A protein has these predicted regions:
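Bacterial N-terminal signal peptides that target proteins for export
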Residues: 1-8
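Flexible, charged surface loops at secondary-structure boundaries
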Residues: 37-43, 61-63, 99, 129
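Extracellular beta-strand/beta-solenoid scaffold signature
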Residues: 55-60, 80-97, 112-129, 143-159, ...
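Small side chains
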Residues: 23, 72, 126, 167, ...
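Right-handed parallel beta-helix/beta-solenoid
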Residues: 11-35, 52
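N-terminal extracellular ligand-recognition/capping segment immediately after the signal peptide
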Residues: 28-30, 44-67, 74-83, 111
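Right-handed parallel beta-helix
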Residues: 70-75, 102-115, 133-145, 161-176, ...
Length: 219
């Protein structure tokens, strides 16, 4: 009886472990997408998303990371975010007195975002892309303001760039609070420096609608 019970418990534990694996880096499994991201160092890392995920705390891409999140081809996975979007950071080279960009790529993913804030809580934006190259590769990105608040849909801060490639469709709407923008960028603490490119290629499209101030504001 004891052996049978132990075997049953082990089988149940194995089944739970298998079901709980949300993402993989190589053969290593993770129970959350954020855990998989946190495991990355400065070397390029590819994360395979195994399941659809629904997030209320957003995603944080730490300084210096180079992360690609793949969501499959035959059955693309969905990343749903409610309340908070994405916060990325770069690294500062004190000797060179310049920022080194981080890199974040979503590939074959569906992103469904309803947010007005980000995990860092700064920038008055749903997605704070700070000193980072953000690439959307064959991605469907649909984003709406959670409550029509005053912040922007995305803030490209300092040395940040946005690339839409391979048929990506990005739609941002509903940021119609006072002086709200779909995508916002300025030269805060980065005056007269090369930064903040938005490049759209390979039959991709960027649609920003129903915002108060400017759909895309670069000052």
């Amino acid at each position: 009886m004891t052996v049978t019970a132990a075997a049953a418990a082990m089988t149940a534990a194995m089944a739970f472990s298998s079901l709980a694996a949300v993402a993989k880096v190589g053969t290593q499994e993770f129970n959350s997408l954020q855990d998989a991201i946190n495991s990355a160092g400065e070397s390029p890392v590819v994360i395979d998303l195994e399941e659809n995920v629904s997030l209320t705390d957003g995603l944080v891409i730490g300084a210096g990371k180079n992360v690609t999140i793949q969501c499959g081809t035959s059955d693309p996975k969905t990343i749903k975010m409610e309340g908070k979007g994405i916060h990325t950071e770069g690294t500062y080279d004190a000797t060179a007195k310049s920022w080194n960009t981080s890199r974040l790529t979503f590939k074959n993913c569906v992103l469904d975002i309803a947010a007005n804030d980000n995990p860092g809580g700064s920038g008055r934006t749903a997605n704070l892309i700070s000193n980072t190259d953000l690439t959307l590769d064959h991605v469907t990105w649909t984003q709406n303001s959670a409550n029509g608040g005053s912040g922007s849909g995305m803030y490209l801060y300092q040395k940040s760039n946005l690339y839409l490639v391979n048929g990506t469709v990005m739609t941002i709407s509903g940021y119609k609070g006072s002086r709200a923008s779909g995508i916002f960028a300025d030269d805060s603490e980065y005056e007269d420096m090369p930064n903040r490119s938005i490049k759209i290629s390979d039959h991709s499209s960027l649609n920003i609608i129903d915002c108060d101030w400017h759909c895309i504001l670069r000052s």
